[in-house]
């Protein structure tokens, strides 16, 4: 983006999902990226892509024999998961509560890499987004789809409805959408 639009001032900061939303609601920044559903009365929401979430297990774990899993399969299993600052944590814990149990979360982290390491060591299970699993793929790990509902990571770009988009924001939106189209067409790899 900076190469294509050198005259547009661009600053980028990365935070977990919930702090991004809190900062953006407090008028920090012009554009935000986050995961989940958003109030479309407050924000112009551009859905970017939706990714399936699966259960991450060591291939030696008994659940690795399954072709698909349900949320009930997590009951009693030690789990490593991204912290409560991320939507994936709330999706999984809410589904567990709806199924009538509390997940056995033994560690909350700020990233998927520790979850993958602990599952590789067969210390427990985790959940992961398909593209993260593909990026971090290692022998001995298996990502199993959920069969009891929609488990998705919906990435969105947000701007505020009550603000007129300046030229920089418009150019950035176009750049992001063109970049995603190139990924979808196979022209570039994520």
Question: Where are the regions that the model predicts?
Answer:
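Central regulatory/effector-binding core of bacterial HTH transcription factors
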Residues: 1-40, 109
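A local structural motif
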Residues: 4-12, 97-106, 141
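Beta->alpha turn/N-cap motifs
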Residues: 16-17, 33-38, 58-59, 111, ...
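Alpha-to-beta junction loops
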Residues: 24-33, 53, 101, 119-126
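Beta-alpha-beta core module
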Residues: 41-52, 113-162
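Flexible hinge/capping segments at coil-to-helix
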Residues: 43-53, 57-79
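Short helix-loop capping/hinge motifs at secondary-structure junctions, enriched
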Residues: 60-70, 149-151, 162-168
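Secondary-structure junction motif
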Residues: 78-99, 165-173, 180-189
């Amino acid at each position: 983006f900076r190469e294509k639009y050198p005259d547009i001032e661009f600053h980028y900061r990365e935070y977990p999902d919930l702090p991004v939303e809190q900062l953006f609601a407090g008028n920090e920044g012009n554009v935000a990226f986050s995961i989940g559903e958003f109030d479309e009365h407050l924000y112009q929401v551009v859905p970017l892509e939706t990714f399936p979430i699966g259960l991450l297990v060591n291939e030696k774990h008994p659940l690795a024999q399954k072709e698909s899993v349900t949320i009930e399969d997590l009951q009693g299993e030690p789990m490593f998961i991204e912290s409560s600052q991320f939507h994936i944590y709330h999706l999984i814990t809410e589904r567990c509560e709806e199924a009538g149990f509390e997940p056995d979360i033994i560690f909350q982290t700020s990233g998927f890499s520790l979850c993958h390491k602990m599952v590789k060591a067969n210390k427990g299970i985790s959940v992961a987004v398909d593209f993260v699993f593909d990026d971090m793929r290692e022998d001995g790990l298996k990502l199993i789809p959920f069969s009891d509902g929609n488990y998705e990571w919906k990435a969105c770009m947000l701007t505020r409805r009550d603000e007129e988009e300046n030229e920089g924001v418009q150019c950035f939106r176009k750049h992001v959408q063109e970049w995603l189209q190139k990924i979808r067409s196979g022209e570039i790899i994520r």
